[in-house]
Amino acid sequence: MIDIGELLRAYRKGYFPMSDPSDGKLYWCQPYNRAIIPMESYRPSRDVRRLLRRNDFRVRFNTDFEGVIRACAAPRPNAVETWISESIIESYLELNRLGIAHSVESWYGDELAGGLYGLAIGGAFFGESMFYRRSYASRIAFDRLVMHLRKRGYLLLDAQIMNPHLQKLGAVDIPHKAYMQMLDAALHKKIPFL
């Protein structure tokens, strides 16, 4: 398990952990460009809006954090390796018990159909990973997260490293210096997640 104090200090300084799938070694990452979701300009896609109207999924917070993080860590069809090691899982389970790590879950009946997890510190939410078992389930969870963070007054939704999926969700890359300024402002807020 990663030392919880060290983990929280790292996030406050703009770092996040990833483990190497080949040997399990932990690395602290601080990319030069940081992917963030500009919450004020976020708009759900037409498909997500349609699914929200149909009400096929129920979104819950923190009812199955372990189920979400383990689903995120599971091998995916297009990638056999994962950066989410058992050490990272145990650390985030402890952060969840402490009320710092949270899951946003899309339920389809009694099935955990998709979701995401991350950390809430001050006015910043650090999104870690998402998964889905039914089409659009993770996007529904993501949409509800953005709406929740907006309503609570969060200043930063950190998506860490840009990828095509995050781009579809509206993520943009910003330089390290701009990210650190946003992070500093967000960390000075005291906003409960729930």
UniProtKB/Swiss-Prot annotation:
Acyltransferase in keyword set: yes
Single GO biological process annotation from the record: protein catabolic process
Gene Ontology CC: cytoplasm
Source organism, top-level taxon: Bacteria
Catalytic function, reaction form: N-terminal L-lysyl-[protein] + L-leucyl-tRNA(Leu) = N-terminal L-leucyl-L-lysyl-[protein] + tRNA(Leu) + H(+); N-terminal L-arginyl-[protein] + L-leucyl-tRNA(Leu) = N-terminal L-leucyl-L-arginyl-[protein] + tRNA(Leu) + H(+); L-phenylalanyl-tRNA(Phe) + an N-terminal L-alpha-aminoacyl-[protein] = an N-terminal L-phenylalanyl-L-alpha-aminoacyl-[protein] + tRNA(Phe)
Keyword Transmembrane on entry: no
Main location: cytoplasm
EC number: 2.3.2.6
A Pfam family of this chain: Leu_Phe_trans
Compartments, as annotated in UniProt: Cytoplasm
GO MF, one annotated term: leucyl-tRNA--protein transferase activity
Alphabetical UniProt keywords: Acyltransferase, Cytoplasm, Transferase
Known function: Functions in the N-end rule pathway of protein degradation where it conjugates Leu, Phe and, less efficiently, Met from aminoacyl-tRNAs to the N-termini of proteins containing an N-terminal arginine or lysine.
Family: Belongs to the L/F-transferase family.
NCBIfam families: aat (TIGR00667)
Name of the protein this chain belongs to: Leucyl/phenylalanyl-tRNA--protein transferase
